[in-house]
Amino acid sequence: MSEAGTPEAPIKKKRPPVKEEDLKGARGSLSKNQEIKSKTYQVMRDYEQAGSAAPSIFSRNRTGTETVFEKPKEGPAKSVFG
């Protein structure tokens, strides 16, 4: 037990050494039996199964189906500078 004026030093615990073979086994089993639940991954997989490339966010040829919140605007894109 410590006295009122002396702070106790925290006890530092050392980690056990990690073997390279343990790391290899852990990396392989991280997502072994888990389905990826990302919307981006789902869209990419759907386009891949359809045999086409997924639309890019940088493409000017959007269809309006890439996002639910924004529909394509009529006419050419306006400049942000003028």
From Swiss-Prot:
Q: Which tissues show it? A: Expressed specifically in the musculoskeletal system (skeletal muscle and tendon). Highly expressed during bone regeneration, especially during the early phases (post fracure days 3 and 5). Expression within the fracture callus is localized in osteoprogenitor cells of the periosteum, proliferating chondrocytes, and young active osteoblasts.
Job description of the protein: Required for chondrocyte development and proliferation. Plays a role in myoblast differentiation and fusion. Modulates skeletal muscle extracellular matrix composition. Plays a role in skeletal muscle function. Plays a role in glucose homeostasis.
Name the family: Belongs to the MUSTN1 family.
- Subcellular localization: Nucleus; Cytoplasm; Secreted, Extracellular space
Question: Can you tell me which residues the record assigns to a coiled coil?
Answer: none
Q: What name does this protein carry?
A: Musculoskeletal embryonic nuclear protein 1
Q: Which GO terms describe its biological process?
A: chondrocyte differentiation; chondrocyte proliferation; embryonic limb morphogenesis; glucose homeostasis; muscle organ development; positive regulation of chondrocyte differentiation; positive regulation of chondrocyte proliferation; positive regulation of gene expression
Where along the sequence does the record place the motif called Nuclear localization signal?
A: 10-18
- Start and end residues of each stretch annotated as Disordered: 1-37, 51-82
Q: What keywords are assigned to this protein?
A: Chondrogenesis, Cytoplasm, Myogenesis, Nucleus, Phosphoprotein, Secreted
Q: Does the keyword Nucleus apply?
A: yes
Name the principal localization, coarsely classed. nucleus
Residues with the Phosphothreonine modification? 6
